[in-house]
């Protein structure tokens, strides 16, 4: 089969935003205007096409990013051929940042939605940081311009101030709040209005209202200046007073957007059907095709040092990244992949280069929100779901077995909160194990383990809402009823002092004995190193080199169990520099035990200390309740970092230990008669005060 859409006409984009900026409504409109769904879904009715889990429809928030394929030829059919959009809708709730992170990893561009009233909110900053991390070119869409207090230029100023990026508006708003009528298109210098009769499908262009002409001229020259900075040639032309053509301006803005130098801004109201077609036009005009961005990097599975790359081209060897695993009630496991190079047909064999395992592709489907269309092949630039993968986890690479590559992996955050779960009945016991296994395969920020002492099953995740929803899914999708314990904080441990410790394990008990002996220098790890930094300085073969990996393993295993109160030890540098061995009695096991024994002594010799997770908390509250909210945060050992006034009320920023924040949602509501809202995300680990250490150590007993 030949390619139906040239790769230059592909746009792989994500719609990302803060919880209530109107992201899902915007995605719904995208589907409507691109002709994929004939009835508009409203989030308020719980009928949105992309929100397909029951929990999402009930809570009105998006939890799993659905990938949808749609086509667009321009709001006024200005393009000769259709462009193919692969759109990913992502959640904005902080407990699901992992979903946003993994979608951004496979996108080529993003539309970042802001609310015209509340502007830059805490989660917007998180999403923006993630987009920076993956270098994703983006367009800003200021939505909800029909809401009370909406102000396009104020949001633009906020983005500049709080996100450190200067947006370049290519539109201005005509009116605002109840009087929001449309946009000024700064490229064509026309006013654009929308008709209710066709649900805002086709723009109506008219001259700019006289009272807005001066403002439009000012912002047009701002846009032209941004374009002129794309090259010396354009800059000279601009400085000499020559007019730049709209084609030159467009090409220059596109070049600078893709390079990440500028962010273009548009506005509208998705709910009132005013402006989404122009957002789609901007995606075509300014966001990159897979061929416009650098080739994806990877490494040779046999030698990590050897770097490789794959270009977005059908003729290159096949490579794809699995960015999401979902369980579907009808077909079982769906593995969502982004194809970076080559072609894959159903029935083909591929290799999972991370695990070195062969997989055969059964069927392939392209998703339209919750409906699916079977396809026979996927090509470079495509996003599709594969059925029949046996052992693939999020972030792994599928590729041609003869030309293997491991694409750059994703980093997943460590969970900060844990709860014990118990099945309500004996029958649920086995079902619960299967259900938790499937959920953990889908979501890498969710972990399951068994407490060796109590035999309880412990689940860990990114926040209370995250775990609530997973337990809820267990009940609905797998029919498992479970009781949940009280949330527990995931503490960490670290050492504060440098020390040298001897680990010696000798056992003689008739026949063959055990002998392992090593000297290890321990120190806090270098800045930015979370795990174990292991160094081998053994010279002269006093410890044979085949036993060195066993020493590393012994240290790692003890780190998992901690040295102070049984919590994982982080940021440790261990240098093995001396030791001895026995010709007959030495083996890997003996050296592993010796290293583990040395590590255990760190509590005393290394100044071991307990760390607690600190959360960045933002509370938005009416001024009347500000005193109560701040007093309460102080009582929770919070540190107030600052305050600012916004349209939605006072915003209080603080850092608070997670252990003090359980049940905060209920407390802050009752304190403010339901009018305050808050968001929090993990910030860092800090030394825990002595009373916490005492309590935790006692509990661990």
UniProtKB/Swiss-Prot annotation:
Location within or outside the cell: Cytoplasm
Q: Binding of GTP: at which residues? A: 17-24, 89-93, 143-146
Pfam families in alphabetical order: EFG_C, EFG_III, EFG_IV, GTP_EFTU, GTP_EFTU_D2
Keyword Protease in record: no
The protein's matches in Gene3D superfamilies, at most eight in alphabetical order, are given as:
3.30.230.10, 3.30.70.240, Elongation Factor G (Translational Gtpase), domain 3 (3.30.70.870), P-loop containing nucleotide triphosphate hydrolases (3.40.50.300), Translation factors (2.40.30.10)
Alphabetically, the GO molecular function entries are: GTP binding; GTPase activity; guanosine tetraphosphate binding; translation elongation factor activity
Q: Which family does it belong to?
A: Belongs to the TRAFAC class translation factor GTPase superfamily. Classic translation factor GTPase family. EF-G/EF-2 subfamily.
Q: What does this protein do?
A: Catalyzes the GTP-dependent ribosomal translocation step during translation elongation. During this step, the ribosome changes from the pre-translocational (PRE) to the post-translocational (POST) state as the newly formed A-site-bound peptidyl-tRNA and P-site-bound deacylated tRNA move to the P and E sites, respectively. Catalyzes the coordinated movement of the two tRNA molecules, the mRNA and conformational changes in the ribosome.
The protein's matches in CDD domains, at most eight in alphabetical order, are given as: EF-G, EFG_III, EFG_mtEFG1_IV, EFG_mtEFG_C, EFG_mtEFG_II
What's the protein here called? Elongation factor G
Q: NCBIfam families per the record?
A: EF-G, PRK12740.1-5, small_GTP
Q: Name one GO cellular component term.
A: cytoplasm
